[in-house]
Amino acid sequence: MCSLAKSPSSDTSTIVRRSANYDPPIWSFDFIQSLPCKYKGEPYTSRSNKLKEEVKKMLVGMENSLVQLELIDTLQRLGISYHFENEIISILKKYFTNISTNKNPKYDLYATALEFRLLREYGYAVPQEIFNDFKDETGKFKASIKNDDIKGVLALYEASFYVKNGENILEEARVFTTEYLKRYVMMIDQNMILNDNMAILVRHALEMPLHWRTIRAEAKWFIEEYEKTQDKNGTLLEFAKLDFNMLQSIFQEDLKHVSRWWEHSKLGKNKMVYARDRLVEAFLWQVGIRFEPQFSHFRRISARIYALITIIDDIYDVYGTLEELELFTKAVERWDVKTVDELPDYMKLPFFTLFNTVNEMAYDVLEEHNFVSVEYLKNSWAELCRCYLEEAKWFYSGYKPTLKKYIENASLSIGGQVIFVYAFFSLTKSITNEALESLQEGHYAACRQGSLMLRLADDLGTSSDELKRGDILKSVQCYMHETGVSEDEAREHIKFLISEIWKEMNDEDEYNSIFSKEFVQACKNLGRMSLFMYQHGDGHASQDSHSRKRISDLIINPIPL
């Protein structure tokens, strides 16, 4: 049993420490435990199953290819396509076969772009040259497209974000469509064009493309917009609303479980006054990474991991002295409970909680997979703490890294690798040595890309506040210091890097990988969640109106039926 006796190094009375002045959490334990979880069991399950069968018949019985593609798109945006994964794959396979054998009908731009996007999303290698039919003799996209086909331009815009490295046609399509859609919005603002449903979709797309959006947030937004349309399908709408609420009830049960663990750990209760108590926000990340009902265990485990990352990150970033941080890093590397007595008092509870949580998770993996994972789990934490320590040394020495040097360390210190190791064991049915070695050595591109996107999105949303707290330079400031550009120019460069990461992410085929499809999707969804959480600032630490709305929309408040 771990002793919590006072250690020789625990006298901190003369140490002047930084403080981030984090606000206490607005979501109390009692509030979380009072969530009703209303939409579960009968009669909701029976009604959901009935609606699901009706939608399935609708989907597979369609003969018009464009209408069928539009239905798949609508199912995706309503957040219910996961119920029809097998049917959608079977349908799209036929469309891809037609393209491969030159039997595809002659589509207009809208239908071509829609088909292209859906096929790319499901891993089909549709060539970008399919859009050459919409170019003129000079190789430019035809000017006539813009005159009367806003729907087609918007579809091409969304399709262009599935671009991979070297795909110049899709690059040109993105520039072409973005410029036109921005002019279209400007004309709406000047009352030159009707501000209708299409205008709403265009504004939404320019804010962030569909491919980059997180599924549950998009479902909530689209359900509300779809309900306003005149040609809405009542069966689809009812099923989408009911499914959203039933999933939300599962999320509430998951959150209650995690909240009880947090309460028992005593890491809340205002004991960690120097760190962020953001359990609900930590859980929200997991909803975005894997929302499907069968992944409750993943959400419950990963929320713990994210909450612990937040606490330990703040110890390194804000509160600890360099000597104390070196002690904590060594304790994690040694992974011996006896080392807790060498730590300052304020570090003992976080270390003890980490130690117990990791070992508990290793037991779960052993029970499910008959695989001893503790070395992989604790090594991921040791690497994370070493990266934290490196940044602490930069801070205390006043070192200003280049952007490249910063990214090499910061893409690891953001905690993505820890998250992915736990996701791997939680989401993988059959563990292979090849996949495990690739993950352990950091070779898997989707993990690196997801972590880097998380880091850069975090920096865009939080760097100003973190600098005020006395943190190290972030990517924006590193680039400014290195090149002499303005902050606005530096931020644009970081946004450009994010778009480049997406090209690499698009190269990762989740349907043909040494990793499970569920794990690959989790890697990509971490990138999506990072853009979602930091879109309006620090969506993890801040408890502003944007943050409260995100949590209320996705976890707290059901959609009226």
From Swiss-Prot:
Pathway: Secondary metabolite biosynthesis; terpenoid biosynthesis; Terpene metabolism; (-)-alpha-pinene biosynthesis; (-)-alpha-pinene from geranyl diphosphate: step 1/1
Residues where Mg(2+) 3 binds: D458, T462, E466
Protein's UniProt keywords contain Magnesium: yes
Pfam families, per the entry: Terpene_synth, Terpene_synth_C
UniProt keyword Aminoacyl-tRNA synthetase, yes or no: no
Top EC category: lyase
Catalytic activity: (2E)-geranyl diphosphate = (1R,5R)-alpha-pinene + diphosphate; (2E)-geranyl diphosphate = (4S)-limonene + diphosphate; (2E)-geranyl diphosphate = sabinene + diphosphate; (2E)-geranyl diphosphate = beta-phellandrene + diphosphate
EC number assigned by the record: 4.2.3.121, 4.2.3.16, 4.2.3.-
Renumbered ranges of motif DDXXD motif: 313-317
SUPFAM superfamilies named among the record's database cross-references: Terpenoid cyclases/Protein prenyltransferases, Terpenoid synthases
Binding site for Mg(2+) 1: D313, D317
Family assignment from sequence similarity: Belongs to the terpene synthase family. Tpsb subfamily.
Comment text on domains: The Asp-Asp-Xaa-Xaa-Asp/Glu (DDXXD/E) motif is important for the catalytic activity, presumably through binding to Mg(2+).
Name by which UniProt lists this protein: (+)-alpha-pinene synthase TPS2FN
